[in-house]
Design a protein with these regions (language model features):
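Short gly/ser-rich anion-binding loops that grip negatively charged ligand groups
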Residues: 201
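Glycine-rich nucleotide phosphate-binding loop and flanking beta-alpha elements
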Residues: 83, 91, 377-378
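N-terminal low-complexity, Ser/Thr- and acidic-residue-enriched intrinsically disordered segments
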Residues: 78-87, 158-162
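Conserved phosphoryl-transfer catalytic core
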Residues: 93-184
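Non-catalytic pre-domain segments flanking phosphatase-related domains
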Residues: 3, 7, 14-16, 23-79, ...
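Short intrinsically disordered, low-complexity segments
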Residues: 13-17, 22, 150, 174-177, ...
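C-terminal cap/substrate-recognition subdomain and adjoining C-terminal extension
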Residues: 26-57, 63, 67-74, 188-193, ...
Length: 430
């Protein structure tokens, strides 16, 4: 397989970022290399790498809420790129692909990868290496041809060859590259209502426990991976109908200690914590219901697949639950959460993307909106909220907080600035 590192990785603060899934109950410890605060100042959260104003504002919010009876208020968090650095669903997909962790026959895989995908050509950004357009019919045929070979030969499916031998075949390279390419092409071409659920269907025929196991192994693997851009290219020896294609992603998923601390402090202060994620429910539950997050399972909402009678996941979303992205996050709060708190909206909403902007702006009584800065477009609601945060920074009555991050290291930075992967300088707004 052709692997290309597009950017140099800056491997800083690894000890700060890593979390051993086998020792999650340990107390989170953050670096506090900041000037000492006077006794008159509120100290609730550990300093870590928070922007100082953001920390002080969150401290004040928590201290005020503690004056009310426990469970009077609640906070809602996104997971991917908010609670964590990068996207756990995407990281799990890479691990699943590289280890061929599938429980589907070729015919079942066909039903999954074609599910709800329009026949139109993908965006020109996803043309093949010859500049020609690609669509689901073309790349789907190539994926299924290679998966059939893998299914017949790999001893983890129906064959008798070990993975080490399977990896030498161009079918392995072709399958994993074109699957990851398809995921990117769907997301970059079609509506989020199509693209977000699609990747969750790859768990078809697995139990929740199997998904949780894959997730734990993914986190363990990723915590020692460099933070960098990676590119895969499909083998020229198997162009198929789609031709040779390329796909890239941001490697180095990390759990963020500042957010772990925030979860803990909120709950210890009597503020209930909810997680609403566009990733698969079993993936998210396996992380946030454990220490140090310790969120009750009933307070976790994500893409909720129906199960069979023997508790295996299907490729159908449970219609009882809204799609947990965009307006669906607001719908989830209104349908399952708000009435438990006398109709109040969340005290705090934390997110990073357009998928979070509705729940950030739909509840007038929300006191604080925390945005993890990823330089969102000014044409979006979250882009406008980010602009508001820059304007309000330092003001006592600020509602929106913008927290900076360096995407070359995976850590928060003590400012509002976002530094993209490979960039040398950060900025507050796009």
């Amino acid at each position: 397989m052709k692997f290309i590192n597009r950017y140099s990785a800056i491997a800083l603060a690894v000890g700060l970022l890593t979390l051993n899934m086998n020792a999650q109950a340990e107390t989170v410890s953050l670096n506090t290399n900041t000037a000492s605060q006077t006794s008159a100042e509120i100290q609730v959260l550990q300093q870590g790498q928070w922007d100082n104003f953001n920390k002080q504002h969150l401290d004040a919010m928590i201290t005020k809420a503690k004056q009310s009876p426990a469970h009077s208020y609640y906070a809602v968090f996104d997971f991917d790129n908010t609670t964590a650095f990068l996207d756990i669903e995407e990281a799990v997909m890479i691990y699943q692909l590289e280890h061929l962790l599938f429980a589907m026959t070729p015919q079942e895989l066909k039903s999954v990868i074609f599910k709800d995908i329009p026949a139109a050509d993908f965006s020109a950004d996803f043309n093949n290496k010859d500049g020609k357009p690609v669509n689901i019919d073309k790349v789907g045929a190539d994926i299924l041809e290679s998966y059939q070979w893998l299914y017949d030969n790999y001893d983890g499916l129906k064959g008798d060859k070990p993975l080490s031998e399977i990896k030498k075949s161009p079918h392995y390279q072709n399958f994993i590259t074109k699957m990851r390419y398809l995921y990117a092409a769907i997301g970059g071409t079609f509506d989020h209502a199509v693209s977000y659920p699609w990747v969750t269907y790859l768990f078809m025929n697995m139990t929740p426990e199997q998904v949780a196991g894959i997730t734990a192994k993914t986190i363990e693997w990723q915590k020692s991976e460099p933070v960098e851009g990676v590119v895969w290219e499909s083998p020229a020896s198997l162009p198929g109908q789609a031709g040779v294609v390329e796909t890239d992603w941001h490697n180095g998923f990390r759990l963020v200690p500042e957010m772990q601390d925030l979860y803990q402090v909120l709950q210890k202060s009597g503020i209930d914590v909810y997680v609403i994620s566009a990733s698969n429910l079993e993936v998210i539950k396996s992380i946030v219901t454990q220490a140090p997050y310790s969120v009750p399972e009933s307070q976790v909402f994500a893409m909720h697949l129906l199960r069979t009678k023997d508790n295996k996941l299907t490729s159908d979303l449970d219609p009882v639950y809204p799609q947990t992205q965009g307006k669906g996050k607001t719908e989830t709060i209104r349908k399952f959460i708000q009435n438990k708190y006398a109709g109040k909206g969340p005290l705090l909403v934390a997110g990073d993307s357009e998928g979070d902007q509705n729940m950030m702006s739909d509840f007038p009584d929300t006191e604080v909106v925390l945005i993890i800065n990823r330089l969102r477009s000014p044409d979006t609601i979250i882009g406008q909220l980010s602009k508001q945060a820059v304007k309000e920074h330092g003001q006592k009555d600020a509602k929106v907080l913008l927290q900076g991050r360096n995407d070359s290291t995976g850590v928060f930075v003590p400012s509002q600035l976002h530094t993209p992967l490979g960039a040398k300088e950060g900025r507050a707004l796009k």
